[in-house]
């Protein structure tokens, strides 16, 4: 069994010994620490917390523990039930709550679950805030409410309709153009909450022809829930043998979006953000964009094509959001299909990603494959190197940066990013595993692989 504690929350596998995994005891301890932190921050005797969950098998069990612990800590709770991550984030601000807890392990397999923690803006906590909650949890520095001050469950209603109506109200979403285009769409929601949210969104957008795959929110994922090409053979085959205009694939909590073209070919998860950004930059006559250091260079190219400015952030949604606020970014996100559109909210949101992409598709008059051909074409490779426990990763990365300082532009905000004229490499230590990750991008898959192999060999030579 596994339990991983980090600044963004706690995640682990369900079951096992009392000292292992994400069990009722560790769940209650961490929830109590979060509630204590919120009470300290707000100075409120009864803070209001939103709780939402994806469709994982363990979701009901974890939900009961989390809500019960929050009540025991004197917090009031609005339980919005089965909900996407962005829906829960928007409910925090919509209900003027003091925080929120999302019960989801995102793209991890079904035996995993997690608690993701939000502030009163519906955004993930900062590094300092996360560390303080970990400290409170470890020290058990919290007190439960007495019997006269136990919290209450104020409501148990979905917030999905409010979320969808907010998407439709965006000036950049053209519902009439989408309706007139009369698209036939397919989607795969991997047996989680996307099976509830996507049909409702398509209906609101006037999309009448919908082919649904793995839409029943049972938590029994039909395939690996991470939306990568090797896991999406079913929807690709279904589209390739029918007259579908576009396919959408989401992960279990609907904050990542992958697109399939009309031939059943993978659009490229990195290019979800590129396409949506291209549309918004054109609509607004330019603007600033942000993605993390491991995301495709194509976003920078498209941004500069429209006269805008691109900025890279450290890996992690909270870092991307911080940089977006600093630069006043029009759009941002991550290369894993995460679209962050501040006009709606500061969080990755596949629902707004779908609405914006369908608007782009309708207005362009192009097929999805034709749209993809208008963007710069790059290929990526991802490698890893196991890190022995006695090795100082910081010293290793410092050595790498020094040796390559004259080879290209060096960025050290998150590991070592080396930008070369036609390619780049990003080497960073994993936040959750004892490994070093190597990301490369080049004009061809062969060149990206060669670059990754080169840097893997360099790192291994440091370890020998």
Predicted ranges, named:
Residues 1-68, 72-73, 152-184:
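An N-terminal, well-structured beta->alpha segment
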Residues 13, 113-242:
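Gly/Ser/Thr-enriched, mixed-charge loops and adjacent short helices
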Residues 36, 48-112, 200-260:
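N-terminal small/polar loop signature for handling phosphorylated ligands or for N-terminal nucleophile
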Residues 51-53, 187-189, 261, 343, ...:
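Short glycine-centered, acidic/aromatic-flanked micro-motifs in structured strand/loop junctions
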Residues 101, 114-115, 119-133, 255-282, ...:
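Glycine-rich phosphate-binding loop of actin/hexokinase-like ATP-binding domains
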Residues 134-165, 169, 262-335, 339-340:
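Proline/glycine-rich low-complexity loops and linkers
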Residues 246, 284-464:
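Phosphate-binding and adjacent anionic-ligand microenvironments
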